[in-house]
Amino acid sequence: FQDHRDYQWGDDPRAIHWAAYARTGQLTMKLYRAEVSPIVEIVLDASPSMFMTETKAIRTESLLLFCLESALGNGSPVRFHAVCGNRIIPLEIDAVRSGSWKELIHGLGADETMPVIPVWKGDGMKVLISDLLYPGDPITLLGAMNAGGGTSVILAPALAEEAAFNHIGNIRLKNCETGQTRIQRITPSLAAKYERAYERHFSLWRETCRRFSASMARIPAEGSLSNALCGDALRQETVEMR
């Protein structure tokens, strides 16, 4: 066991720390690793938009490693999965550390739909690394994530250039998930409409996270990871300084 707490009525007497009782006369309960450091489930959204630019790909990988080292540093058991749409694969810790996970996720293909994540456990910490750039009601994902209790956290890498059009006129647009392209004329009014839709999308995610008592932070892809985590993530108490 790794810790102890005071005995409470109804506790299993088999877990009483009798040696401590002999010394102090106080009933205490042994706490084992799973109780002190609950399992951390980390799921990576492996859809192509997470790796759309080198800057965003680097941020995605840095968040994955940050979550790994944070969990291990806390003495918590950790499990990894990568998901794209309704396809999901486990990732070994060694693969995450070495970077070989990037080869493994190629088999997941591309899918622009909201991921289906059946691996969440009822208790412990659940961490989703995803840019949340897919259609659908956030309730679908957060309902499954929050089922059974525990702590739910979303870390969303965000690329500044995704939030607005920097070009007015004809532009070739490419769906990074499907590879489809089209020519679109961007007018000032259309650019403004896009920006409002983008803001509404993430406002809906934030509102739904609050309803489910989940923590969500958007992590800028630009700059160092330490600086990026000192923004929204620190304000939302998704991470804490130690």
What are these regions (language model features)?
Residues 1-5:
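Intrinsically disordered, low-complexity, positively charged segments
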Residues 6-11, 20, 29-42, 46-62, ...:
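Exposed, interaction-prone extracellular/peripheral surfaces
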Residues 13-15:
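N-terminal juxtadomain amphipathic helix
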